[in-house]
Amino acid sequence: NIQKESTLHLVLRLRGGIIEPSLRQLAQKYNCDKMICRKCYARLHPRAVNCRKKKCGHTNNLRPKKKVK
């Protein structure tokens, strides 16, 4: 039964099964809505002003993470 369900899940994925909008938004929040440090490439929260890493001297040289096409 588990194998049957996993196969069904895989088939839906391969056919381009839709992701529920709320789950998609949640995934985007955790993976895409980030700021990136230009010196050390650390992933930071979207409202970050300075980097949290010591190795780049807590620089304020940040950019938004590029969006997936």
From Swiss-Prot:
There is a cross-link at residue 4 (Glycyl lysine isopeptide (Lys-Gly) (interchain with G-Cter in ubiquitin)). Keywords: Cytoplasm, Isopeptide bond, Methylation, Nucleus, Ribonucleoprotein, Ribosomal protein, Ubl conjugation. The record marks 9 as: Essential for function. Residues 1-17 form the Ubiquitin-like domain. GO terms for cellular component: cytoplasm; nucleoplasm; ribonucleoprotein complex; ribosome. GO terms for molecular function: structural constituent of ribosome. The gene is UBA52. This is Ubiquitin-ribosomal protein eL40 fusion protein. The lineage of its organism: Eukaryota, Metazoa, Chordata, Craniata, Vertebrata. The modification N6,N6,N6-trimethyllysine is found at residue 39. The record marks 13 as: Interacts with activating enzyme.
